[in-house]
Amino acid sequence: MFKGLSKGSQGKGSPKGSPAKGSPKGSPNKHNRAATQELALLISRMQANADQVERDILETQKKLQQDRQNGEQNQALQHQQETGRNLKEAEVLLKDLFLDVDKARRLKHPQAEEIEKDIKQLHERVTQECSEYRALYEKMVLPPDVGPRVDWARVLEQKQNLVREGHYGPGMAELEQQVAEHNILQREIEAYGQQLRTLVGPDANTIRNQYRELLKAASWRRQSLGSLYTHLQGCTKQLSALADQQGRILQQDWSDLMPDPAGVRREYEHFKQHELLAQERSINQLEDDADRMVELGHPAIGPIQVHQEALKMEWQNFLNLCICQESQLQRVEDYRRFQEEADSVSQTLAKLSSNLDTKYGFGTGDSSGSPTELLLQLEAEEKQLAIAERAVGDLQQRSQEVAPLPQRRNPSKQPLHVDSICDWDSGEVQLLRGERYTLKDNADPYTWLVQGPGGETKSAPAACLCIPAPDPEAVAKASRLATELQTLKQKLSTEKNRLKAAAVEHLQPGQQAPAGSAPADPQGQTLLSQMTQLDGDLGQIERQVLSWARSPLSQSSSLKDLEGRIHSCEGTAQRLQSLGAEKEAAQQECEAFLSTKPTGSAALQLPVVLNSVKNRYNDVQSLCHLYGEKAKAALGLEKQIQEADRVIQGFEAALALEGPVPEGSGALQERVSELQRQRKELLQQQACVLGLHRQLKATEHACSALQNNFQEFCQDLPRQQRQVRALTDRYHAVGDQLDLREKIVQDASLTYQQLRNSRDNLSSWLEQLPHHRVQPSDGPSQISYKLQAQKRLIQEILGREQDQATVSRLTRDLQEALQDYELQADTYRCSLEPALAVSAPKRLRVISLQESIQAQEKNLAKAYTEVAAAEQQQLRQLEFAKKMLRKKELDEDIQAIHSARQGSGSPAHARTAESEVLKTQLEEERKRVAEVQRDLEEQRQRLLQLRTQQPVARLEEKEVVEFYRDPQLESNLSQAASRVEEEGKRRARLQAELEAVAQKVVHLEGKRKTMQPHLLTKEVTQIERDPGLDSQVTQLHSEMQRLRGENGVLTARLEELKDELLALEQKEMNVKEKVVVKEVVKVEKDLEMVKAAQTLRLQIEEDAARRKGAKETVAKIQARIKDLEQAISSVEPKVIVKEVKKVEQDPGLLKEASRLRSLLEEEKNNNVALARELQELQEKYRVVEKQKPKVQLQERVSEIFQVLPETEQEIRRLRAQLQETGSKKSGVEQEVEKLLPELEVLRAQKPVVEYKEVTQEVVRHEKNPEVLREIDRLKAQLNELVNTNGRSQEQLIRLQGERDEWKRERSKVETKMVSKEVVRHEKDPVLEKEAERLRQEVREAVQRRRATEDAVYELQNKLLLLERRRPEEQIVVQEVVVTQKDPKLREEHSRLSRSLDEEVGRRRQLELEVRQLGARVEEEEARLSFEEDRSKKLAAERELRQLTLKIQELEKRPPALQEKIIMEEVVKLEKDPDLERSTEALRRELDQEKNRVTELHRECQGLQVQVDLLQKTKSQEKTIYKEVIRVEKDPVLEGERARVWEILNRERAARKGREEDVRSLQERIDRAEALRRSWSREEAELQRARDQASQDCGRLQRQLRELEQQKQQKARQLQEEGRLLSQKTESERQKAAQRSQAVTQLEAAILQEKDKIYEKERTLRDLHTKVSREELNQETQTRETNLSTKICILEPETGNDMSPYEAYKRGVIDRGQYLQLQELECDWEEVTTSSPCGEESVLLDRKSGKQYSIEAALRCRRISKEEYHRYKDGRLPISEFALLVAGETKPSSSLSIGSIISKSPVCSPGPQSTGFFSPGLSFGLTEDSFPIAGIYDTTTDNKCSIKAAVAKNMLDPITGQKLLEAQAATGGIVDLLSRERYSVHKAVERGLIENTSTQRLLNAQKAFTGIEDPVTRKRLSVGEAIQKGWMPQESVLPHLLVQHLTGGLIDPKRTGRIPVPQAVLCGMISEDLGQLLQDESGYEKDLTDPITKERLSYKEAMGRCRKDPLSGLLLLPAMLEGYRCYRAASPTLPRSCVR
């Protein structure tokens, strides 16, 4: 109905500019979403009401026409009542429409004006119908002399009383009713105006004046109601929102059973950071509006004040509840944290107690191990107990602070004291913060009954009250834990004493054991005890140092704790030195003792103990040294952190305590200087932050050394890193805050200076005004002169009104700037102290400087108004004096006439004439006074309206005024145009110069993005003007807007340059003079500087090109301005003057001209400032250019170095040696630890038994078989290590290949795919060369970057030095060279692009051919192998049967006969080929069996190795015992064993070294890739892609040739074997007898070998059983493969990798990009579980915790085998494969087609209706089904889309187009993955269809959406369009046929499908068309079968389709061309062979 809705509305009445749901603009604010929903509902309701009014009008017209005909035929009028009812209903609906349109205007609907026009048209039509109704039904027959009379005075007085007595509010419901009533009254009053214009009579003027006053009063009341409604609506919304928020807080359970405290905390923090300030600004705005309305005397002061007080009270209560919420949340979190830690400590104590009872219990029989081992384990238990003791002490201290939360929900048996957390005032109940009450009843969890200090009882909200600490349960729990701890400590000390005694008893037999066998050696025993003592001391020192390294620092006093540890570490180091001296002395004694070759147990143990002591001493010394370095670095870092925190806190405190700007002329400048001083001090403290980062790097280096050597992680490092990052962020935040405040104050200072100048000029002008007072002696001429002068003065005063407006505008701008300054300060203060924004009282929003400025502006405005009024009064006095003089002259003339007549008339007649003259003069004076009063009242009312006018107000003017061209205004406009042209030229020059300087400075720091100017769209009310002047003003306005935008860009650029220069000035110099002098002498030319100079030259050329473009733009603007001037001069104003009736000056043009003047002045000032800044920059840069760069050129070159490849190799070799030494050391330590228990066991054994066993073994066995087996096992293990080394080499090759691939694919934001699986690849020499070239490029890039950094640093230092010298200004003239793009280079680029596309196409074609040929080769090989195996098997079986028959015949025949006949014939005459083949087969079988036996033997050896390893790990003591005894027996075998172990250790060390090399290589690859991303070129990428394509093509061709050669070679081999077999047939027949005997022997050998195999298999089964028994105690083996997707962002300045969060915090990306990258990050982990049932692989998303089974995905066909193999081969990324396995797809963001197209009923079965059509009837509707959705590939057993099938030549393009048109005609293009349907445009965007077929698909889509009738503007279905002739039947028939076949026809006005018979009955289609659709024999066969190539109809195609079991979609079978040809050639082959 509405025109506004039909012009570009976006569906269902949503406003054009309103953001859609879920858009970034609409989502952050709930109020915007609510307003959008309310507006949509409002528009839909207005649409329905307007449609109903339209129907009522049409029906009324019809009824009136019928009754009018009845009246003409003298018949009765039949429709009077029905017509009256329709008109009444229409009037009621119009009333609602007028109310709704006001709401739409307040909600800022963009088309509200057009909607209101439509409603007015409806109202006029209803009014016309009402007049026709009255004319027809209410005819009154009046006498001829009596006409219609209306008492207009009484009617207008009644309306005036209604307007005057109208109420305001007090609520929203009453106010809405009042607005509706006044709108009706306003329309009635406006309707009176049409009749009063034609009113004639004596009282016509009085009635018109009365009507005019009534109209003004009604307009005033309407504006008052509108402003009141807007204000009360905002207050109501805020009150409801505050009530909801208060209710959520009050209804929360704050006891220990509170659900999800973490979620409540997150929600509260989010509200505090993002919504609190916005809500406070909204409430402050409402309060300001209320204050302004009360100040201006709004008639509804009462409701406004009531709502204002309610809003203030609710806001204060809400802030108090926020305090309560934060306090209650803190109590709940403390309580839960205490309970969790107490439970953890309790579990720890229980576990320790259980260990003491089970492991160390005396007499229980469960304790295992020697007492020494148990003592060592007990020491670990003591450490855990010490940690638990500290935790219990902490819990006891915190138990006194935990609040008793359970008492909040439990009814109290005795009165409890509760404290009030905040102030609360609900009217009935008042609470004071900190006051204590007595709890009487807490049965209601949300409202408690408390008793105050005075004895009064009140019901208070429970959220505002808290029960004070401590919690009795928490105290009891802490005490109980302390008791358990003491008990456990006593038990542990008891067990420790018992174990020590047992250890002493256990050692005594071992000390006496050697006495029986050998004499004791006292020197050996002494040395052994001394070395044992040293080992114990070293172990104690090691444990002490490790305890320092593992325990974190104290949080409260970290410095003291760290200093104490360093002091203790120094003491430990001194003690270690003394132990080292003792160790050296003891070592010399031991070596001297061992050189005498002593005997005895001490001599045997002494070498081992000595080696152990030496190794431990080295380890402890290294550990102590590393920890000392780490502790010193950490101490320096802690001191630096405290120093930086102190410095930053000082700046933050200064910024937080900064007060408002004081009153005074120089206050702003003082504030600017203060901020600059603080910024300089901040830059001076930059060294503190840099030192902080240096200390952090030193600490990280020390911690990494400790971790790499001893695997000890530093517990304090993460905390220190977080503190450093936080301090850095705070430092940058302080700097940003200072810059922002300085910029705001500087802008405010400039505005304040302009304000002072304007105010002073206006004040001085007001003081110097002339006074034209009337003097008694003035005559008529003097009065006339003063009157003319006074009029000129009045005109000048009116002209000065613009200056007064400028002062007001500047005052407003300055106040806004100062308010922004305060807002920024408050925001920063709240960020420092989060509770300040809630707890602090609301401060005054107007500071002292604002008050003074506002007072001065008010005084100035008052003085101006008084002067204007006084001068107006003076003008009236002069006019009155002139009239009085004229009257006096008239009286004198009259008197002269009377005296001259001499009695010609009577005196009475003279008096009568005189009285008539006086009466006429009196009437004239009265009229003038009334007119002046009326004008004054109009001005007063207008002034009041302007003051109370809302920002968005509608201006209605009924009077149309024609304007003429003012010559003065035209001259002013021409002058303004010329000045604009001059300013444009000056700006162009300044811009070119500024850009040149900016480019030269910017290239030192890098390119920055320029800020694009924002487009400012301003909606203005259109006024009819002269077209020529209007176009000129529009053009000038656009030019000024463009210049202002450019000025903003230049100002921003200038500010950036100033900041950079200031930062460069503050940096300190760090010049190394010696290095400079030496390197200046040596270096003559620097290649990097040459490159930098070339780059600078290129940038200068680019700047010249930009300058040329700017000049061309200026020339265009000048030509445009000249054209405008010519157009202005060509206009003839004389013609326009003739048409003008009312000559006035256009106030809009006057204001526009004055505004242009002010803008020009501002632009001049800005240009002056820019020129001054430009001169400064030029001076600075000129000084930099003059200074020769040789002094500082090589300042940091000495620091730039590159490690030589030989050095890197040496470092790697040393690192490998170091790791090998470490591995040897660890192996020796493990051996020593294994041998020590054995020594004690040997000591405890009886010497006789040991001696006899040794003697027997030495005598009887020279070589022990077990030792030999052990040697064989170790050799096998050595072979296994060699194989592992080979696999590592293969892994290295694979990683190198992946590195090269990553170098080609990685970009700015990279996705790292980390896989731990090993895939074997071969080295590619081409890729190796490419990698070397890339490394060289990376090194060159690093050198260029470092050289650039050096140049930047040098120029900064030069600039700093030259700035201090302050040289004189000079003008620099530079020659700029204009460059253009080379067309040859552009053609070469396009040619390379085309050639790359051709190469890609050829490569894909070759890949397709190779795949087809590969498949054919595999099929042929499979067929040949199958036939060969089958023929061999048949031949062997036939030979076996023949041999069996022959043997049976020989056995059955008599011996003589056999001897005479058979044997001779066989030997002499026959050669049996079958027997020969059988023999060969048996030989091959024998070889296979031998190989199998060998493999089984090898497997048996491997299993034996595993069994030995398991036995070794399970029972180490027994194994080591045997080895120790045999070591003593056979030193040869011991040497062999030592050698094998040495080889094993070397192999392990080598493997670790290779793994370290692989890791280092991977890291270098990552670093190289990170640097390469920023230096890659597009041409290099194209060239590499082309080379890769050619390489792949060559490789594929080579593979194809190799396959063909292999095939030919196999064929030749088969032929050669056949020929050789035929040649050997004759000779083999002669040896048949021998072969038969050999066969018998072979059969016997085979049986023997089978027996051996069976024996081996039995042994293997036993070993398997043993292995399975050993693995029973272990869990199922699980292999995990980490596959993570991590987003890295390259930092623009340093080139380092950053996470998305770091990039977002540093401002590199915005919040939207951060959220998008955060969603892309995932951490997939492939977990493969091996169990007896097999292996099972699942994908685990470590980020969300979800698991997805790969086997289940294969079974459910979410993935295919091809995709699985691609993933295993690394060709499918993990992210895509994980999404396929999980079955997740991206959700559809919108519906398929527009707002009027609903989804298919399959997807959304509920009925839907649109906002533009009535629902209609829904009878006879059926559900639809999907059309043919895709193609089923029979070759790969997969589905694909129609677009992909056409691209693969599986489907005819015409058939594909028909299938897509069928989808579009039945609801949209189908997406096979998501089963969603999309419109044609959406499908093009998603890539489902091609762009070439869009138009045909759009035509087909009309069958679903319908078309619009050009005449009636109604939506028609295609059947109706055919009947009306709007569409041809031939083009629509296929679409209707598809709809009929898929469920029925589609009517766009209804949901669901309609059968053809029902459509014929409804008139949707004709009967002929219905018969044509139902006749299946006449269906056109326009489709082609992809397999059989026969023509078929759409129904036949649907019959041949296969239905997808998952989605239910129809898929048309098809196959590839190559497979189709092969199947046609060999149709009898099975499917497996074909595939």
UniProtKB/Swiss-Prot annotation:
Region (Disordered): 1-37, 63-84, 400-419, 1607-1637
Keywords: Cell junction, Coiled coil, Cytoplasm, Cytoskeleton, Keratinization, Phosphoprotein, Repeat, SH3 domain
Stretch list, region Globular 1: 1-841
Subcellular location: Cell junction, Desmosome; Cornified envelope; Cytoplasm, Cytoskeleton
Signal peptide (residue range): none
GO cellular component: cornified envelope; cytosol; desmosome; intermediate filament cytoskeleton
Composition skew (Polar residues), residue ranges: 71-84
Superkingdom of this protein's organism: Eukaryota
InterPro entries, per database record: Desmoplakin_SH3, Plakin, Plakin_repeat_sf, Plectin_repeat, SH3_domain, Spectrin/alpha-actinin, Spectrin_PEPL/EVPL
Protein name: Envoplakin
